[in-house]
Amino acid sequence: MKVLVVNGPNLNMLGKRDKNIYGNFSHEDLVKMIEDWGRKNGVEVEVFQSNHEGKILDRLHRLDFDGLVINPGAFTHYSYAIRDALEIVKVPKVEVHISNIHRREEFRRRSVTAEVCDGQISGLGVYGYLLALEYIKKKLEELT
């Protein structure tokens, strides 16, 4: 069982961004937390981060994973290319946001990518990733 975790633009800057919105975790801390979860749960996890839409598309197009957690960052609000790629990916998938996008600026409240995911977790900090991973693990176990 392999789960891909994709982080979009500016998520590499966690720990340097507004701590009231994004918390104190660095991207390195987030990767370690996800990898630790994978080891404890017997799940292979790969964390991929890019600030470039095309690189995210190329990674998704490899289709070499059984489940997907994606935080598209700002691409959430306007990337129909990522939306279309997510539609191609026929695995359990969850969109995650560290901040509650529904309590932020108006332009951040619309997700064009969530509607092609199984669900969206928003506003629970980095722990939203763990909830998404738990869901995907359970869903994959049900399918086997």
UniProtKB/Swiss-Prot annotation:
UniProt: substrate binding residues: 71, 77, 84, 98-99, 108
Keyword Amino-acid biosynthesis: yes
GO MF terms held by the record: 3-dehydroquinate dehydratase activity
The protein's annotated pathway: Metabolic intermediate biosynthesis; chorismate biosynthesis; chorismate from D-erythrose 4-phosphate and phosphoenolpyruvate: step 3/7
Catalysed reactions, semicolon-separated: 3-dehydroquinate = 3-dehydroshikimate + H2O
Record organism: Thermotoga maritima (strain ATCC 43589 / DSM 3109 / JCM 10099 / NBRC 100826 / MSB8)
Name of this protein: 3-dehydroquinate dehydratase
Alphabetical list of PANTHER family matching this protein: CATABOLIC 3-DEHYDROQUINASE
HAMAP family noted in UniProt: AroQ (MF_00169)
InterPro entries in the cross-refs: DHquinase_II, DHquinase_II_CS, DHquinase_II_sf
Catalytic residues as annotated in Swiss-Prot or TrEMBL: 22, 97
Pfam short name (any one): DHquinase_II
